[in-house]
Amino acid sequence: MARFVLRRLLYAVVVLWLTATLVFVFLHVSPVPVERVIGGPRATADTLDQIRGNLGLDRPVLVQYWRFAGRLLRGDLGDSYINGMPVTALIGQRLPTTLCLVAGAAVLWFAGGVLLGVLCATRARGLGDRAATVFVLIGLSTPPFVMALALLHVFSAGFGGGAVHLFEAGPPLQEHFLRRIVLPWIALAFLMIATYTRLTRGAMLDALGEDYVRTARAKGLPERRVIARHGLRTALAPVVTQLGIDLGALVGSTIVTEKVFGLQGVGQLVYQSIALGDTPVIIGVTLLVTSFVVAANLLVDIGYSVLDPRVRLR
């Protein structure tokens, strides 16, 4: 296990380095010059040359890359081109909101999807199973931004405000924010609850048909114990694997969700940075998302081996 974790950590370092390099190259060949972004449309040629010199953009590309790599190794992501703030501080201000959004939605969809999937599998072809099938079809057909807009229109009158002013930006631990972030959770989780209900139902039906489950029932074990200890544990393995994949997609979905609900999170930050051409912030957010995805997949691999003892990490 220790060797596996160490190897995956080294793999994570390589992935982060390649990601940073690719982003650096893509942004370096951007059709919008950085000095034009900072100086504005009315900047003179002398002003643009001065900006390029201050940023070191007049040096060869390899020199710029090694300078960028050296700062990255020190944990220095540079300063924002737009407001001059350090990128780490800028991301740190927005990160709690996005973490609260991602964590809440992930817990909601995983718990809700697994619970509904188990109930459908244990009552296959019953009324509840058929109702859940209809819910799954609706959920799979509803994109998160459509659900977000629908929730805004339905609940805005109840909160006493329009869609624009319904959600106030602020730390996620404030009472008003906790109360109002439930709707973004639902908007993000609705589609995934349907997906995980279908996935868990199929995996659970396969697990309950295995010989070791029939043996456990033949021994007279209580049905709840058979389902929880023998059926669910095996059925969760593919579900947890899918969770590692979907967590990365969830981070991307927060960009649209934060935009719709007016939440000042990392998704809103990267949206604004792309629109304004703020290169350091784009690189910083990209590395953050990559780190999150790599860490999530590492935890999923470890969890898979715990759920299914037949799997051994090497």
PLM feature spans:
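Alpha-helical transmembrane segments of integral membrane proteins
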Residues: 2-3, 91, 95-130, 144, ...
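N-terminal signal-anchor/signal peptide hydrophobic helix marking the start
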Residues: 6-15
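Hydrophobic alpha-helical transmembrane segments of membrane transport/permease proteins
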Residues: 15-66, 155-180
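Membrane-water interface segments at the C-terminal ends of transmembrane alpha-helices
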Residues: 22-29, 59, 70, 134-165, ...
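Hydrophobic aliphatic residues
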Residues: 26-30, 38, 42, 72-73, ...
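Short, hydrophobic secondary-structure boundary micro-motifs
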Residues: 36-38, 63, 78-81, 147-149, ...
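An internal, D/E-rich "acidic patch" concept
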Residues: 58-114
